[in-house]
């Protein structure tokens, strides 16, 4: 209801002032979001969630788009999250408050939330109405409304300290409320329903007047007691940077706020009185009708039950019962814990987003549905079990899920399958699809209970046994090219054949030590189906150290090529069989066979002609094979730069050898010698078809080509879904809105004036430079290689619980309530930390100046020591030291670079005295023009100066 009123009011206002700009920005740019909010409002209305809206404090923003930003898309604060609470505690500054009319109309629109309140006082009003005491019911209603109205006035005009003190008295108010209600019950049972009519007023007061005052004071007192529900919503989300949202005197002049807040409270009072009179005019005839039908006896017991229940719920009112009757969820997330959340399908990712980074609405349905139907993927939607309704629907209009599915179930995320790598691999094109074998459908259950299973387990095992034959060659290739796979002791051997795991719970005999699987990032090939990695037991730290010590004793840190060759062969024979004449196992030999030239033994060959298979050349090939094994074995410690350097050197050596060979052949022809015939080289495509790994030289000089082939064959390899979401969120227009409103506005909401000395003013200038330097580091960090989202843990596939495979420290990630919260927390991580160091936001002990005084929120921290010479703390926490020294030395991949979505010119926020609103600008704008008296300490006679404090930097 409040959302609909805000939308109507915003439409009327903008159409009156600038219709062209309104239609372009709000319907063309923000139209889909508005339609989505309307649909969400209809769903919430059908599920009776609007009952909870009536109880909240109704200080909402009149601008529809601002309300949508705060409630659905933008994280309003890191501590409180994207909850509607901050939106209700904020008075809009985006709409000009001309002549104070907007706050007045806003107060009239918000008055129903204070009038229509289900409370103990409301029950008393109905009781007095049932006794045909109309004037008593009116007085009780007015007392209740007046108490609620006074609390709102106290909050708006800066009396939040008084509200906080009253909040600490909530236990006593509840005890008093319960005792008073039980007193009424006692009098009700002993005297009867008409005990109020027999009471007499003190000091000779007229009984009618005394009863009226007593009833009015009763409603007022109970209304204050029941304000603990509102206090909980007021005090709970407070944080140091939200204090100005309550008292509102940090910018502008006092006159502006008096006019703005005064118009709002007047409109709230007028609307409440008018609506209350309308409600009473409807209830009084209804009660008269009920009295004639003699329903007072039945209504009496129900009212008594409601009174006793409502007064016995601490920190909650009747809204707790009406909005949480099914599951009794926590108070802070009653909208987030429902399946009707507007961001229901934000976790779904298009199957082609890894190539385009954007989704085209016109092609989403055409590309997703055939791909889904070809794989027999039909989701099944199940609602909450407590509701008891079920329905099935095809997601024909939604993008298909192509990566790891997650969902918020309660407070945690639950993966849809045991192994995420298996899921996004199985959704690729199945090699057995054209042979008459189909896969079982994927069943998706809402909410928080996803699972993915295969019906034919035998088919999965057979495919695993067939496809695992090439795992050694593939793993070896990936170790050399990608340098992120470390596979040792993958499967057991039985009579020379590689055997797969029959069951996850079966005993798995490993010929090599299992520490190769512990604390390593193991990336499985896409064709490996069975989740056999999770069957390996955990190892204690002591066992790891003992195994590592034993391994070091067996193999010294520095070995010659012959020693390494001997050690490798002795261990490889156990796993892969007897080595061949090249010194390599047979499983690895097929990829290293070189083409021998067909030499005619009868022809005389000049000794000057270089024989490609001479002793030196053969030694070079053997050395190359040993180097390849060394790289494969120690790929974990070989950086990519070393591999690229070796590849370039090897390519240069082969080029020179080819030139020398051609020169020798040319000289032989000039001398009339017979040149041996050689077979023509196969093309690159034929080489790839005949031998996917190619010759040993292709590991080096064709390194980039191999990477392209790998991307074509396995497009999902090594590409995490959160990187796709990062590009999608950063490319959205709301990201810029978030930067302008939530970041710079928070930094700019420093006090507009202070009693400062010259030393304090110098410290202020220092902190201005510090914050500017910090924001410059953020802009450098945006194009840095390190600007990526959370990386998987080192033992990604070894974690027993899929929830533990991401972000070992749980810094942000899955604690965020939405995708935008996740991006916001990751992008601006450390911003508040630096600001708290520069401008201490609370009265806690100052850790950076243990000998200095304590500072408040609006005071400055002392100047840092200059003899240290370390300005690294002004940089972002995730930027390494080498990047700080030379930011432009790194050239990250295009897939890891975040596109800059805003200009490098920072935005400032300030108070415009003409428009009487906070405005965003790229130029320096003073906050106010009022002259402030300044007291200089250290003088016997105060010297008053005129001083103007202006906003001179982007962050203070």
Curated annotation (Swiss-Prot):
Q: Compositionally biased, Acidic residues: which spans?
A: 592-609
Stretches the record annotates as Disordered: 580-609
Protein topology in the membrane:
Multi-pass membrane protein
Provide the primary localization: plastid
Give the coiled coil ranges: 640-672
Q: What subcellular compartments does it reside in?
A: Plastid, Chloroplast membrane
Which UniProt keywords are listed?
Answer: Chloroplast, Coiled coil, Membrane, Plastid, Transmembrane, Transmembrane helix
* Protein origin, superkingdom: Eukaryota
Tell me which GO cellular component terms the UniProt record holds: chloroplast membrane
Q: Where do transmembrane segments lie in this chain?
A: 40-60, 104-124, 137-157, 166-186, 264-284, 301-321
Family, as annotated = Belongs to the ycf78 family.
Query: What is the protein's name according to its record?
Result: Uncharacterized membrane protein ycf78
Q: Give the source species.
A: Nephroselmis olivacea
Query: Gene encoding this chain?
Result: ycf78
